Amino acid sequence: TEEAADQTLNQAEVIEDGSKIYVPTKEEVKAYINRMLKSMSKAGNRKPVFYNVSHNGYVAEAYYETTVQGTTYQWYPIGLVSGQTQQGNFLPYVDRYDISFADKVKGFDKKARMIYEFDPADIMYSYMYPAMVRTFRTAGFQWITQFSYDPMDIAYANTEYQTHFLNLAYTPHKAISMKIASEAAQSLKRGASYGSYPQDTLFGEGFRVSYTEDLSELNNGNKFYYSNTTRTQPKDAS
């Protein structure tokens, strides 16, 4: 009815072109998630369910009042689809990963935390991946997934989604950086803090990142990985 339509528009948000979009309430979001969970359970799902909470922070409480087992986030600290190769030192951009409602929402620490996609997009440098993973671990993330898909036929440029560019064939230095980042994800303690840039370019057991050297490095006595030329000597050369 016209009256119902007016009530709906009262719960709407005006966007730039003057049109309106419906903005759900906290209770509606909670009910929607619970209906999905019920449907998945009836379909036989027995695996943990994660829900993306990195948007619509005004209803963040609703996410944590459901029975989802985990929450998901993403990070593109220098943007996406710039149309050009970005230049510069982006390490200060990844000093912190702040979750605005972390200390405001009841039950925040009772749900697992996952990064469902991340990438320092539009760069050719090899120093960023371990730094981002370091910050994710400081923020308490348990699962970290990098966004990239480069079929071999288009891997030279990734024309399908050119803002992402990571593969062993054409960006071996970045691939090694990602390998080092994987080591960091598995060894760095959740919640551990490593200070601010530039102090946090050295972290954990043998990890180092450098903008001036375009370098990711792991040198812990058992493993010596480096993404670019380095003057570092192996901790244990035997």
Residue ranges and their predicted role:
Residues S54-E65, Y125-V133:
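Short, acidic/polar
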Residues P48-V49, E61-P120:
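Glycoside hydrolase catalytic-domain groove-lining segments
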Residues S39-M40, L91-D153, L166-I180:
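Catalytic-core region of carbohydrate-active enzymes that cleave or remodel glycosidic bonds
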Residues D150-S238:
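Aromatic- and carboxylate-lined catalytic core of secreted/periplasmic carbohydrate-active enzymes
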Residues P24, E28-R35, A131, I176, ...:
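Extracytoplasmic/secreted proteins, especially bacterial periplasmic and envelope-associated proteins
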Residues T1-E3, S19-E61, A112-R113, E117, ...:
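Aromatic-lined carbohydrate-recognition surfaces of secreted/lumenal glycan-active proteins
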Residues V29, Q69-I78, T138, T145:
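Acidic, His- and aromatic-enriched active-site or binding-groove loops in soluble protein domains
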Residues L9-V23:
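A solvent-exposed, charged loop/short amphipathic helix patch at secondary-structure junctions
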